């Protein structure tokens, strides 16, 4: 019998496999139950291991999972790459709804001939039921960006002004939304901006902008940073 007990541990753990895809129903391989403050997963079928063999077994498969795809550009961290991310909720309504231990999530999508094709994978941490799951699947092929610093001024004692322009290019035949993520620093304050933005934390802002098909979109902003002297 094969059992997996998952708990948060202070030492490195093994990674386990999950699959998220579109298509028909998936056969159930593991049953799950609570065990003290942990979760016990039991393999519902037999499996054979040869001498010194290592085998990967998919712990959980879910099909037709509704996901939201995001294109994210962070020029300071990733150069010209626009990252492709997926997010979904680990709920029964989404075809999931079970505690997920730390592991690898592989994503598949049907092609025009209804064959499942592997589109990417990412690691996830321990995920509770109804938590949101975010996956980074790679970089967009037809979308890119460039981040340019257009101004850097010491405006006054302890006051610095920096301006940036972000140029997004879309070679797709359809328009798309791109999230521009910027870090303005702990003491930064945005004083000018070309497009509305959301302040995600004390140091991070995000612009959500539309980039036309076969076109480009420019985003600019100015941030003032004050240094406090003792």
Model-derived features: positions:
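Long, intrinsically disordered, low-complexity accessory segments associated with secretion
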Residues: 1-230
């Amino acid at each position: 019998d094969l059992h997996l007990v998952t708990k948060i541990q202070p030492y490195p753990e093994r990674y386990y496999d999950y699959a998220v895809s579109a298509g028909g129903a998936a056969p159930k391989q593991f049953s799950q139950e609570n065990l003290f403050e942990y979760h016990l997963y039991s393999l519902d079928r037999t499996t054979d291991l040869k001498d010194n063999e290592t085998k990967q077994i998919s712990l959980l498969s879910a099909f037709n999972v509704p996901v939201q795809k995001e294109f994210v550009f962070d020029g300071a961290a990733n150069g010209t790459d626009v990252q492709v991310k997926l997010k979904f909720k680990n709920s029964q309504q989404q075809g999931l709804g079970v505690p997920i231990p730390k592991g690898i999530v592989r994503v598949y999508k049907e092609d025009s001939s209804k064959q499942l094709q592997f589109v990417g994978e990412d690691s996830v941490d321990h995920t509770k039921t109804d938590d949101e799951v975010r996956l980074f699947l790679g970089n967009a092929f037809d979308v890119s960006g460039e981040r340019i610093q257009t101004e850097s001024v010491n405006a006054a004692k302890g006051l610095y002004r920096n301006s940036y322009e972000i140029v997004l290019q879309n070679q797709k035949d359809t328009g798309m939304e791109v999230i521009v993520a910027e870090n303005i620093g702990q003491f930064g304050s945005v004083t000018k901006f070309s497009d509305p933005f959301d302040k995600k934390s004390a140091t991070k802002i995000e612009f959500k902008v539309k980039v036309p098909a076969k076109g480009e979109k420019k985003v600019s902003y100015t941030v003032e940073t004050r240094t406090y002297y003792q």
